[in-house]
Amino acid sequence: MNSFFGTPAASWCLLESDVSSAPDKEAGRERRALSVQQRGGPAWSGSLEWSRQSAGDRRRLGLSRQTAKSSWSRSRDRTCCCRRAWWILVPAADRARRERFIMNEKWDTNSSENWHPIWNVNDTKHHLYSDINITYVNYYLHQPQVAAIFIISYFLIFFLCMMGNTVVCFIVMRNKHMHTVTNLFILNLAISDLLVGIFCMPITLLDNIIAGWPFGNTMCKISGLVQGISVAASVFTLVAIAVDRFQCVVYPFKPKLTIKTAFVIIMIIWVLAITIMSPSAVMLHVQEEKYYRVRLNSQNKTSPVYWCREDWPNQEMRKIYTTVLFANIYLAPLSLIVIMYGRIGISLFRAAVPHTGRKNQEQWHVVSRKKQKIIKMLLIVALLFILSWLPLWTLMMLSDYADLSPNELQIINIYIYPFAHWLAFGNSSVNPIIYGFFNENFRRGFQEAFQLQLCQKRAKPMEAYALKAKSHVLINTSNQLVQESTFQNPHGETLLYRKSAEKPQQELVMEELKETTNSSEI
């Protein structure tokens, strides 16, 4: 990330046309330089020597303090132009001596006895005289205002993630009647999102506002592994929820998943997450950056820069692994979620309810509103997943495959990557809101867990589940009886009985929709 700040020390841009070459002016400058040396000071002492020059001397140099300052501010984004401004300010005689010295001597970059003017270019400190291109970066990568925006933004999603997912876990584990297949998937989603909040958000924020890796090699591997596993488990759980909802709505007559099967699927999710992220943990190492040092304070105290990064044998292997992660953690889950929710939406749209009778008309309007609400919810779920993770994966693919300029990479790493991470982690903050608090059963479980009373007393959840189970049995029995009578009377009454058989099946579909709406299956 910080490898795009520096430029080779040999690429200095000299501008001598602004300095007068008249013999009297050269002699005058040499006399001033000699008088300064006789007083015990250096031939050039930066801004102090500039202040000692008379106004006439500054006019003869063709520069004034204001002109030089404005020239510096206009060109501070280009290192070459910044050094050009420095060479303008150096007296000609002293500049010539230093040019000869640079050609004949090698300066020690860590020696305090040598003369090392340091200039701030994009918050980066450069040693102008150095045979080794060492770039000095500030410990904090951003101004305090920008860092405050990052901290507040990350703290907001961290707070929502921790509070929301903790409440979801508490509700599901506290109420035994909520131990259903879908709720177990939601519980697993909340656990993985909690891991994202604990291990991903603080470390990513720290990495985005300071230079280097402040922890050791063990923490580098553990944090990288846990971050990858938690993100992968969260995405895989979203796919499991989509498949479970798809089976309940599109194929309501097929056997549903059992609690035991749900536990097996959850174990498979975590095993897959560990397997796909293990190569990253193996390749993660803390490495010292040879050409960069961190400037810790205003007294020019510095320290080495360490990075926690993947050390692949070659760039092609890194590209292959990035592509595998992109396909398995974003592209394939996204395709499955869109396909499953698309099929659910089509099934809801095609579901028919009898239109005859005033009661049926009212039922139709109620069902129509429920269908619209459910379809909107499915669209929101799919769009949030797409928009949350697309920027981060796009940046990761661009970093590995696109031929970006150093300036583009610098902007991406310092400003765009923090926003992309924030957007991706925000998905873990909104998941408990979408999958938990938007359904009636979780609100009821929240009320029971914290013993809250509403104005209207509601039936106990166990009784509600029992009534739903009885209604399912009655609907299935009536459906089978009607189908049997249809086969026994294949002539004139077939159409009548076929219409009769259609109603229980549609009622069953709408009952499934109602149940999934209330128990997070839609």
Swiss-Prot record:
InterPro entries noted in UniProt:
GPCR_Rhodpsn, GPCR_Rhodpsn_7TM, NPFF_rcpt, NPFF_rcpt_2
Query: Could you confirm whether the keyword RNA-binding appears in this record?
Result: no
Residues bearing carbohydrate = 110, 122, 133, 300
Q: Which Gene3D superfamilies match?
A: Rhodopsin 7-helix transmembrane proteins
Q: Name a single GO biological process.
A: detection of abiotic stimulus
What topology does it adopt in the membrane?
Answer: Multi-pass membrane protein
Per the UniProt record, one Pfam family is 7tm_1
Residue ranges in the Cytoplasmic topological domain are: 169-184, 243-262, 341-377, 435-522
Keywords on this record? Cell membrane, Disulfide bond, G-protein coupled receptor, Glycoprotein, Membrane, Receptor, Transducer, Transmembrane, Transmembrane helix
Tissue distribution? Isoform 1 is abundant in placenta. Relatively highly expressed in thymus, testis, and small intestine. Expressed at low levels in several tissues including spleen, prostate, brain, heart, ovary, colon, kidney, lung, liver and pancreas and not expressed in skeletal muscle and leukocytes. Isoform 2 expression is highest in placenta (but at relatively low level compared to isoform 1). Very low level of expression in numerous tissues including adipose tissue and many brain regions. Isoform 3 is expressed in brain and heart and, at lower levels, in kidney, liver, lung and pancreas.
Q: Where in the cell is it found?
A: Cell membrane
- Region annotation (Disordered) maps to 25-49
Instruction: Topology check: give the Extracellular ranges.
Output: 1-147, 206-221, 284-319, 399-413
Can you provide one Gene Ontology molecular function annotated for this UniProt record? G protein-coupled receptor activity
Keyword Glycoprotein in record: yes
**Where are the disulfide bridges?**
220-308
Q: Provide the transmembrane region boundaries.
A: 148-168, 185-205, 222-242, 263-283, 320-340, 378-398, 414-434
What GO CC annotations are associated with the protein?
actin cytoskeleton; plasma membrane
The entry assigns this protein to a family as follows: Belongs to the G-protein coupled receptor 1 family.
Q: What does this protein do?
A: Receptor for NPAF (A-18-F-amide) and NPFF (F-8-F-amide) neuropeptides, also known as morphine-modulating peptides. Can also be activated by a variety of naturally occurring or synthetic FMRF-amide like ligands. This receptor mediates its action by association with G proteins that activate a phosphatidylinositol-calcium second messenger system.
UniProt-recorded name of the protein: Neuropeptide FF receptor 2
Q: Which organism is it from?
A: Homo sapiens
